[in-house]
A protein has these predicted regions:
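Anionic-ligand binding region
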Residues: 119-123, 130, 134, 153
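Membrane-helix/interface signature in polytopic inner-membrane proteins
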Residues: 108-119, 129
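Membrane-water interface segments at the C-terminal ends of transmembrane alpha-helices
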Residues: 1-112, 136-161
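Short hydrophobic faces within alpha-helices
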Residues: 31, 49, 117, 121-123
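Glycine-rich helix-loop "coupling/hinge" segments at transmembrane-helix boundaries
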Residues: 63-64, 68, 162-176
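Short, conserved glycine- and acidic-residue-centered signature motifs
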Residues: 42, 89, 118, 170, ...
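Glycine/proline-centered hinge or cleavage motifs at structural transition points of membrane proteins
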Residues: 125-126, 139
Length: 176
């Protein structure tokens, strides 16, 4: 029995959750500070899009953008010498994109539940916005943030559709 797909999946999900966790938290914080409702709704829709798209469609979009002839893929190949499509990095990219909405939505929900009086009190004590985020908001939202991380890890671990589209099914390299 070949266990390399299990090992590749575990490595991919572990590295992907590091990116997803940070990006999801930062995106949730960024959305909370948007003043315009139209801007919030637009970006919230963009951030949650991979959650409602079929995985193969999301993988197709990733292939279009990050493939050898796509705008981002061509840039990476020509200027950095890095080929994204059909590589192990593509499995990480697919896992990050597909698991990001779960982390983002969980973090946003947890951050929105924080009592605003705590934030106002921290501001009156002279804390910077980033200090408030790390010392007040994250500790109070930690259960929701952790649950988002667990959901995102599970989604990244089980991702196949988008991965098959952008990374292929190369034995010992991208087969998840």
């Amino acid at each position: 029995m070949d266990i390399s797909p299990i090992i590749i999946s575990m490595k991919t999900a572990t590295i992907a959750i590091l990116f997803t966790f940070i990006l999801g938290l930062l995106a949730a914080r960024w959305i909370l500070y948007r003043k315009s409702d139209a801007t919030r709704i637009f970006w919230d829709g963009i951030f949650t899009m991979p959650l409602v798209l079929p995985p193969t469609v999301a993988g197709f979009f990733l292939l279009v953008f990050f493939g050898s002839y796509g705008p981002v893929g061509k840039l990476f190949e020509n200027y950095l010498g890095i080929k994204i499509a059909f590589s192990w990095g593509a499995t990480i990219l697919a896992a990050v994109v597909m698991s990001f909405p779960l982390m983002y939505r969980s973090a946003r929900g947890a951050l929105e539940q924080i009592d605003e009086d705590l934030i106002f009190a921290a501001r009156t004590l002279g804390m910077s916005e980033w200090s408030i985020f790390f010392r007040v908001m994250i500790p109070n939202a930690l259960p929701g943030i952790i649950s988002g991380g667990v959901l995102a890890f599970a989604r990244g671990l089980g991702e196949f559709g988008a991965t098959a589209m952008i990374a292929g099914n190369i034995r010992g390299k991208t087969r998840t």
